[in-house]
Amino acid sequence: MSVLAIITYDVKPGRIEDFLTKLKQAADPQFHSPVMPKSVRLYRNTVPGPDTGPVLLLIEYADMAAYGARTAFENGNPTWQALFAAHPNAPETLVSVQLLTEF
């Protein structure tokens, strides 16, 4: 069964390009693992405007085992951890993580 991780971020005003740059860095081959997501998609509000509200990152995995393997890779990679570490100057703030399974 497919697993969908929905990661919600608040992006600071005027910092969306910085956040997109960070996501592009996350796609670098140094972060490729034996198990990779099936798809990665980024959404934002359309109404009342694109710079209002949260940004949603949707990452789809083949199953819970694939999600677990990828999560273990990310948690064990110090460079990945540094890239997404919370700090005051980061363009984004993590709001929530939801993990959904298809049925």
Predicted regions and their residues:
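Short coil/turn motifs at secondary-structure junctions
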Residues: 12-14, 62-64, 102
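An amphipathic, aromatic/His-enriched active-site/gating alpha helix that lines ligand/cofactor pockets
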Residues: 24-40, 48-51, 60-97
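A beta-strand edge to alpha-helix "cap/lid" segment located at domain peripheries
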Residues: 69, 102-103
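A structural feature that tracks compact, well-ordered secondary-structure segments
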Residues: 7-10, 26, 45
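Short, low-complexity Ser/Thr-rich regulatory SLiMs
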Residues: 44-46, 101
